[in-house]
Regions:
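The feature marks the mature, well-folded catalytic cores of soluble enzymes
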Residues: 1-113, 120-365
Length: 365
């Protein structure tokens, strides 16, 4: 049962951990919607097997499937690719799409050393932000219920995200945290008053207050816009990511003639003002961006910042681009405790997202 609005995660000692902290599992949604990848669905399924192959050795994989028939299909693909199924759990939950980062459960964890109510025993819980298809698409009703299914399956407390009597809309790809209290997001995604408006009438101060209550953060920093072609309208996980508590990578476009040059340059100006939760300045590492990719005349949101940090590996989207090697080298230096692996994402990005968009971490207790 969802908690009443006054019992927020922060009030009960919960906060969102960083992605590099230990996971119990990674959540994925087996691809089934042909409109996301026209004519490419089987190709995408093979990419999923590669994703699971690298994640499963270090943690469980919880795979949402539309039906038992889809489960059989997923098992067939994974088995043929040599992926052991011992650590793969299949959960039947019909979905509209497979972008689990945005519609899936957002986990928070309680600091066991923090004094809270004796009634709060669980170390982890789920926040149900109310997915609405990025305020763009009409088919989201099945996706919205994924956090409820996750809470029942795991027997976790479910916090119903509301603010001033309204359901609060947020996607996992629209935020990034360092696990110490600082959260990154963008104005394009959550403050644009005209385009893909998630929470009409809620301004900067109200959204910051809501983020602090439901994710347990103390410090919110706003970047400007995202990359061209991002149909979510400015998700931060395509431009700027924490890689440890005091370091971020920030995407940079060096070609003044590219449409991404100006908004990304503005973010580099803004990042100078970023202070962490303790008032210190973070280290900022430049991450390149691949050359322009188009399909049917549309710019695709190809970005190396859409990597996913699993327990034993960091999965990085690659695009048959000379900058693939550069990005892998930069991230390899930043994640020396994990294998940094390139995952071919030219087909994935046709659906306007890649690795981070598909995955959602479940932290260890």
């Amino acid at each position: 049962m969802a908690e009443p609005p006054q019992q927020t995660p922060a009030a009960l000692g919960f906060s969102m951990p960083a992605e590099w902290e230990p996971h119990r599992a990674t959540w994925l949604g087996w691809p089934h919607n042909p409109t996301d990848w026209p004519g490419k669905l089987d190709t995408i399924r093979w990419v999923y097997t590669e994703i699971v192959r690298w994640i499963a050795p270090g943690e469980a994989v919880r795979m949402l499937v539309n039906s038992r028939t889809e489960e059989k299909l997923a098992r067939k693909f994974l088995t043929r690719a040599g992926v052991g199924l011992r650590r793969v759990e299949f959960i039947v939950h019909p979905t509209n799409r497979g972008w689990t980062r945005d519609s899936g459960p957002v986990f928070v964890r309680r600091n066991v050393g923090q004094a809270v109510s004796p009634a709060v025993r669980a170390k982890t819980a789920i926040v149900h932000f109310h997915f609405n298809g990025w305020a763009k698409y009409s088919d989201w009703q099945k996706d919205r219920r994924v956090p409820e299914t996750a809470a029942r399956r795991l027997r976790k407390r479910l916090f119903d995200a509301q603010w001033k009597g309204r359901q609060l809309v947020l996607e996992g790809g629209g935020i990034d945290v360092n696990g110490r209290g600082t959260l990154l997001t963008t104005e394009e995604c959550y403050l644009d008053p005209k385009t893909q408006v998630r929470n009409p009438g809620l301004g900067r101060q109200e959204l910051e207050a809501a983020l602090k209550e439901y994710l347990g953060v103390t410090n919110v920093f706003w970047l400007g816009g995202g990359v061209a072609g991002d149909d979510t309208h400015g998700h931060v996980d395509d431009i700027c990511r924490f890689v440890n508590p005091t370091t971020v990578v920030l995407v940079r476009e060096d070609n003044p003639g590219d449409i991404n040059f100006r908004p990304l340059a503005e973010n580099w100006e803004r990042i100078r003002d970023l202070r962490l939760e303790d008032g210190s300045k973070p280290e900022v590492v430049a991450l390149p961006i691949p050359g322009p990719l188009f399909f049917d005349g549309n710019r695709l949101p190809a970005s190396y910042a859409n990597f996913y940090i699993a327990n034993r590996a960091v999965l990085v989207p690659t695009f048959n681009d000379p900058n693939d090697r550069v990005a892998l080298g930069i991230l390899g230096e930043l994640f020396k405790d994990r294998a940094v692996v390139g995952i071919h994402a030219l087909d994935l990005v046709l659906g306007f997202g890649t690795l981070h968009c598909l995955t959602q971490q479940e932290p260890a207790d």
